């Protein structure tokens, strides 16, 4: 009996996984067991299952995640996406084809599609692994713990059925400016860290024009944005410290270590000798997600397109694919979109996916896996 991806998806969207993934992981394990596989859950909370062919061959991994961002949005089936009038989306309305709810596209729709391929693909040689992580939306401790030695990764995320071969990385940290505290009535006796924020912000603005990596062929220019600023302890005191939090969206070949060293040196050069600064990354258990780019002419990308995937393009958000791309060619693919013409979709109250796209994504990944492991 064929795997019922739409029934699985409907139940998955109705299973909250924004605070704790235990219930959703239990449902996934039960589904895998019911289909005759023997899943395991490792110490990092990853759900793993494997199928093997009759001969040696490549190892392909299907990966996505089961956690969602809060709050939980209830399940609903409808003919059109939320906030879209009949016919205005450019697709003919179909009764009940649109599933609304938190996680419907990010990433329970992609999960249903990957499960279809995992269960239904004919494997003649090599190995197919399903690896579903528990906390992609926060620290990616599950993905960071995986060591699968694969030859290719297909990562399930909402790409509108396009095959995404690249994505920017994301780093976050705080620039701390240190001055000299003094009475506000005698400002010349101190060195204001808050006043120094002005040239530092200018230096942040100029960083990519003078120091940063060149424009990437597909990902374009990196971005560097100050997002939070904080400083001062008393209203009548020259502040000795000011902190600026920055968000970095990187492109290859920039690395986490290289960016830190270059940014700190660049910003320091804009300060007078009476002040100093330092830059520290925000503390987290796992490495930040680095930028990656799989060649557009790689076998994995070509196979996905031949199977029916859409255009080759970058993915619009940071993803755990970053960890896997260090080891093997990696693409991001799945039903649903991050945003449509009417606004945000993933991580938003309007989150939805089309059931027909979930089915089509499953067909595409199944065909690609059969080509790679046939």
Regions inferred by a protein language model and the residue ranges of each:
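Metal-dependent amide/peptide-bond hydrolase catalytic core
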Residues: 174-374
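Short beta-strand/turn micro-motifs at beta-sheet edges
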Residues: 72-73, 161-165, 231-236
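Short, conserved micro-motifs enriched in small and acidic residues
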Residues: 101-112, 123-124, 191-195, 352-359
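Acidic/His- and Gly-rich active-site-bordering loop/insert found
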Residues: 1-102, 319, 373
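Buried hydrophobic positions in well-ordered alpha/beta secondary-structure cores of metabolic enzymes
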Residues: 32, 49, 62-65, 114, ...
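Phosphate-handling active-site elements
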Residues: 84-97, 117-131, 204-213, 372-374
């Amino acid at each position: 009996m064929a795997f019922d991806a739409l029934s699985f998806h409907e139940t998955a969207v109705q299973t909250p996984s924004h605070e704790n993934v235990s219930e959703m992981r239990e449902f996934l394990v039960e589904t895998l067991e019911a289909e005759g596989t023997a899943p395991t859950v490792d110490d990092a909370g990853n759900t793993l299952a494997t199928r093997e062919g009759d001969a040696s061959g490549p190892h392909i991994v299907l990966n996505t995640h089961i956690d969602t961002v809060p709050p939980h949005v209830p399940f609903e089936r409808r003919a059109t996406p939320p906030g879209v009038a009949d016919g205005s989306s450019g697709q003919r309305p179909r009764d009940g084809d649109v599933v609304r709810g938190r996680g419907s596209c990010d990433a329970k729709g992609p999960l249903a599609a990957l499960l279809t391929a995992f269960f239904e693909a004919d494997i003649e040689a090599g190995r197919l692994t399903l690896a579903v992580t528990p906390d992609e939306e926060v620290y990616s401790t599950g993905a960071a713990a995986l060591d699968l030695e694969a030859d290719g990764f297909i990562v399930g995320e909402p790409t509108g059925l396009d095959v995404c071969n690249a994505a920017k990385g994301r780093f976050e940290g705080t620039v701390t400016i240190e001055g000299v505290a003094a009475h506000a009535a005698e400002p010349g006796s101190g060195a204001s860290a808050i006043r120094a924020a002005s040239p530092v912000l200018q230096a942040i603005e100029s960083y990519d024009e003078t120091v940063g990596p060149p424009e990437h062929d597909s990902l374009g220019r990196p971005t560097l944005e100050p997002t939070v600023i904080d400083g001062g302890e008393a209203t009548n005191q020259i502040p000795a410290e000011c902190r600026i939090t920055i968000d970095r969206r990187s492109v290859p070949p920039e690395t986490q270590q290289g960016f830190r060293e270059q940014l700190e040196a660049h910003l320091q050069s804009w300060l007078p000798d009476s002040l100093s600064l330092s830059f520290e990354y925000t503390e987290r258990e796992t490495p930040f997600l680095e930028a990656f780019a799989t060649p557009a002419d790689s076998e994995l990308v070509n196979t996905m397109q031949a199977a029916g995937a859409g255009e080759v393009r970058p993915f619009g958000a940071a993803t755990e694919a970053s960890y896997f791309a260090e080891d093997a060619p990696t693409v991001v693919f799945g039903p649903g979109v991050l945003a449509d013409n009417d606004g945000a979709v993933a991580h938003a109250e309007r989150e939805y996916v089309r059931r027909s796209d979930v089915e089509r994504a499953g067909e595409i990944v199944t065909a690609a896996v059969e080509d790679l492991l046939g």
